[in-house]
């Protein structure tokens, strides 16, 4: 487990891009952290590091946003998904099986189920307006 402190959104994005280089196809990145913590900013960095060029946005209303690239990324918001059937219907396991990196916000809603996938855990805590404490477990940067 490693802990990082970022002092700006740009630093959070850069840390995500750095982590992307350490991810294998089909990796699951399980995020925890409150509203506005920086999960989407970190995911923007993942997308950049994976070579995805489309702008990254929060999947809150879409449930999943898919970004094409040399190493594709599926960005899920699990907040409004309530059952494993809903998770399957949204294509969660299909994306993993196809080799996409899957970034899952609000992963604590399915902690036991996602644990079976051997996730890389990223916890982002809001320290102050610009500072974030980011704990990464399951991959070495």
Regions found by a protein language model. Name each.
Residues 1-18:
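N-terminal pre-Walker A segment at the start of P-loop NTPase domains
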Residues 2-3, 48, 82-87, 93-141:
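Short phosphate-coordinating micro-motif centered on Lys-Gly-acidic
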Residues 20-26:
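Phosphate-binding P-loop
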Residues 28-30:
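Short hydrophobic/aromatic beta-strand immediately N-terminal to the Walker A/P-loop
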Residues 32-34:
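P-loop (Walker A) phosphate-binding loop of NTP-binding proteins
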Residues 39:
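Conserved lysine of the Walker
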Residues 52-67:
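Short beta-strand-centered segment that lines the nucleotide-binding/catalytic pocket of NTP-utilizing
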């Amino acid at each position: 487990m490693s802990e990082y402190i970022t002092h700006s959104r740009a630093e959070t994005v850069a840390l995500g891009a750095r982590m992307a280089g350490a991810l294998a196809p089909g990796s699951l990145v399980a995020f925890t952290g409150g509203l506005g913590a920086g999960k989407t900013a970190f995911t923007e960095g993942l997308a950049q590091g994976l070579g995805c060029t489309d702008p990254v946005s929060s999947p809150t209303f879409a449930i999943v946003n898919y970004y094409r690239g040399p190493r594709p990324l599926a960005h899920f918001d699990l907040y409004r998904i309530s059952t494993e059937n809903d998770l399957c219907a949204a294509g969660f396991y299909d994306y993993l099986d196809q080799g996409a990196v899957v970034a899952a916000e609000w992963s604590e809603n399915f902690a036991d189920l996602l644990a079976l996938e051997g996730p890389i855990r990223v916890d982002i805590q809001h320290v102050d307006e610009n500072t974030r404490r980011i704990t990464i477990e399951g991959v070495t940067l």
